[in-house]
Amino acid sequence: MRPDAASLRQIEASDPGVSTWLSANAGSGKTRVLTDRVARLLLNGTAPAHILCLTYTKAAATEMQNRLFQRLGEWAMLADDRLRAELAKLGLDESPDDEALRRARRLFAHAIETPGGLRIQTIHSFCASLLRRFPLESGVSPNFVELDDRAAALLREEVIEDMAAGSNPLAVARLAALATDQTMPVLAAEIARNRLAMTRPLTDPGDCRALFGLPRGETMAGLLGRTVLPGDAALVADLIPLLRAGSAADQGAADRLAGLALDAPDAEALRALEGVLLYGKTAKAGPYAAKIDAFPTKATRAALGEPRLAALEGLMRRVEAARPLRLSLLAADRTEALHAFAAAFLPEYDRRKEARGALDFDDLIARARHLLTKSDVAQWVLYRLDGGIDHLLVDEAQDTSPDQWAVIRLLTEEFTAGLGARDERRTIFVVGDVKQSIYSFQGADVSTFAAMRADYAGRLAAADDRLAQMTLEHSFRSSQTILDLVDRSLDEPARAQMGDPFRHIAFRDRMPGRVELWPPILPGESAKPENWYDPVDLVSAEDPVARLAREVARRIRALLDEGARIPTPDGSRPLHAGDVLILVRRRSPLFSEIIRACKAERLPIAGADRLKLGAELAVRDLGSLVAFLVTPEDDLALAEALRSPLFALSEGDLFDLAQGRPGTLWDALLAQADRHPRVLAVLHDLRAQTDFLRPFDLVERALTRHEGRARLLARLGPEAEDGIDELLSQALAYERSDVPSLTGFLSWLHTDDVEVKRQGESGGQVVRVMTVHGAKGLEAPLVILPDTADYAPPDRELLLRLDGGPMIWKPRADDAPPAVAAAQAARAAAQERESLRLMYVALTRAQSWLIVAAAGKLKSETSDAPNGRPAWYDRIRAGMEAAGARPDGDGGLVLRDEAW
C-alpha cells in the first residue's frame, strides 16, 4: 500500500543519509521521525555508540528510548513477512533480503549489549558524561556530584552569610542596602546563572556611569545642587499654605511637599518633587513633562504671584531635566553594587563547589564548553569524540539555549570540515518548532533556532554537503476544525512574530471537531467579605473566577452524566473523565477554584500537577509536630499539630486546653491526660525517640506506627500522598548532606520552597488540571481553556543584558533611564511573542473538542487592558468569527463540523 503524503514526508525526514533541519508542527509526529531515523541508522550498520541523541527533558529521553526498544524488540519476534512490512514502513528503497532481516532481529540485543547503551540523553546528562570521561582535561573530580537546584540555593545562601560575616562584608552590605531579604537569593541565583556575562565585572564607577550615558564625574550631589537652588526651599515653604487653601488636588500636593527637607535635599526628595511637579508616563504633554500652566490650580497660581510663579516654573523645568540623570545615577549605583558583589561572590561560590566536588547544572554546560574550546586539549578531546559520534540528533531545538548550542556546534565541527577520524558519512538532525518555544525563563532563545539553521546550512554548503530544510504540516492529533481555528486566531501581525510561515493540515480530515466560546464573566463590584476574620485573599463565591470554576465543573459533570460522545479514528465513544484536560496559564486563584469546584461536583480529579511542599497541609501538619518535638514550649506548633488530622482535636477541645492555662500548652495537656490518652501516648513515644532517631525515622514512625499517614489521607484525600512522600525524600536528602538533627531538618525545610511535579495521570480516568507549560507534549480529546482573559505575565528576572553590553540590575519600568528603556521594551515585546506561542501550545493540545472561557478583564476595541494587546479570548473569538462560528443562544459562539 502506497504511503500517504504525511507518511512520505516523515519517511523523507528520517532519511539517515541526509543532514536535516526539521520544523514540526504540534502533533505532527516528530518523536516518530526521531525514532525512525535512529532505527534506520542502526539498520544501515551504524554502531549504537556512534549515535548521540540530545533531548530537552529526561522524560522525553525516556519516552524515545522506550519507543525505540519496543520497536527493536518487536522486530526480534516478528515473522519474515510482517518484519518486511514493518521495515517497508520506514521507507527502505529495496525489499530486505534474509540477511537484512537477520540483522534487524539482532538490533535489539546489539543495542542492549552496547556499553553505555543507546545514547539518548539530555544535554546536561551528556555534558556530565563528557566531564567524567575527561576529568583531568576539564579540571573536575571524576567523582563529582551534581547539585540540584535546592542544594545549589542552600550553598549560595551559605556563601552570602559567610561573606557578610567576614570575608567581604562591604560588598554584601552595599547590595543588601538596595535589595530585600527576598531578592538577595534571587540575585545570587541569577548572577550564578549568567556567570559568563559577569566574567568581567563592572567595578569601576566610571565604566558604570558611561554605560548609562552619564558624563564622567557626574554625582548625585552635583545633580541635586544644580536642580534644587538655595531659594527653592523658601519658595516651597511659601507655596504650601497657598496650596492648603486651594483645591483638593492642591491640598494633596501640599501634604507631599510639607515633608521634604529641601535645605539639604537627597535623591528621595528629588523623586518626591517629580511626583508633584511632573506629569505621569502617559500625559499628553509628554512622559514626565513639567506641569507648566497646570500646577498649581489657576486660583493658587494667581495667589502665588508672577515672580514666585516664574521661580516655580524654573524649578519644574530643572526637575524635569534632572529626572533622567537621577534615574541613570541610581541605575549606575545599583549596577556597580551588583558587579562588586558578583566579583566577590562567584569565585567564592566556585571555590565552595570545588571543595565539595560538586557542579551545578550551569557548570555542566560551561565546563563542557570550556573543555571543547581549550587550546591545549580541545583537539584531543574532539579527536576522541570524533571517534565516537557520527550522527547527532537534537530534539526540541527551539528550547535549546545559546550556551547549549555552543556545545552542540563544537561537537559537530568535524562534521562540516570534511575531515575526521573515519570516512563514514556524518549527519546532523535537528527537529523543533519555533511556535512552541515557551521556556525563555530557562534560557531558551528562539532567535538562536534560525541563526543556527543558517549557520549549519552555510557550513555544510562550504563542505560540499547540504542541509535539507523540511516542515511537517500534518497533524496526527487534532481535527481540521481545531487546526483552522489555530490558523485563524493568529492574524498576520501575530503570525509574523511566530517565525517562518506555517499552515496546519489534519491527517484525519474526516474526524469531526467542535469549538465552544463561552460568554466572558466580566468583573463587577467587589464583594464585601462575609466575615471580618476571613483572609484578605479569600475568593468570594460571586467572584468571576469562582463563578467560572463552578461553570466548568458543572459542564463536565453534565457531559459525563448525559453520556456525551467524542469522535475517535475508530468511531465515537462515551466521554470519560480522563478525556478532559483543563489548562491554565498560571497557578492563580482560578487554578485552585477549578480543583475545588470539581471536587464539589464529585468529579474524579488528579489535583494540581505540581505542588509546593511548604504549602501542603499534610506537610505543614507534620512540620508542626516536628517543631513541637524540638521545642515543647512552642505552643503554636503543638496547637497546630493537635488540630491536624494526626490528633483530630476539635476547636472546642483546644479551647478547653488553652484557655486560662497557667503554663505552656504541653503542661495543660499533661494535666488533662485522662481526656486525651491516645494523644499523650503518641507524643510521649515520639518525644522519647527524639534524641535517638534521625528525622526520616522519626517522621516515618509518626506516619506508620502511629497511623499518621492513614489519618492524613483519610482527611485530606489521596493527593496528600505526594507531599508526604516528598517530605520523607527531603529528610533523606538532608541526612545525606549534613549531620542529621531535627533542628537542622526544620531549617532545611524552611530554607527553600520545594516544588514537586506529580506523575501524570494520562492513562487514568481522572480530570487533569495543569498549566500550559506542564501540558507540553500532552493531548486530550476535550481541552478546556478557562484562563484566556487579559494577563500580562510579570518579568521576574532581576538582571537585564543591554544590547551588546553587560548585565545590569534591572530597574522598575517607570524608573528606567533612557539607556535601559530600549532593552526593557525589547524584553516586553519578546514576552508578548512568547505569550502568542503559549496560546498556540494551549490550542493544539485538543484532539477534537475545545472549550474557551474567560473571567476578568478582556482587551477589545472599546476596553482597556493592562498590557494594551488583545487577550487570548479576543484573538480566539476573532478566529472563530473568521471561521464561520455561529451564536450558541447563550451569548457565546460554537464552531463545529456538520458531522458533530
Label every PLM stretch briefly.
Residues M1-N66, Q70, P142, E146-R150, ...:
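Conserved motor-region signature of P-loop NTPase helicases/translocases
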Residues E12-S19, A59, L72-G275, Y279, ...:
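Conserved ATP-dependent motor core of P-loop NTPases, especially the RecA-like helicase ATPase domain
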Residues N25, H50, V186-L359, D465-L467, ...:
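Conserved ATP-driven helicase/translocase motor core recognized via long
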Residues L34, S95-R102, S129-P135, M316-E320, ...:
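Active-site-adjacent bridging/hinge elements
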Residues I120-C127, L338-D390, D403-V407, L411, ...:
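Conserved helicase/translocase P-loop NTPase motor core
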Residues V682-R687, A828-L843:
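Phosphate-interacting basic helix/loop segments used at nucleotide- and nucleic-acid interfaces
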Residues A710-L716, A821-S835:
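Short, solvent-exposed helix-loop connector elements
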Residues P794-A829:
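Conserved catalytic motifs of ABC-family nucleotide-binding domains
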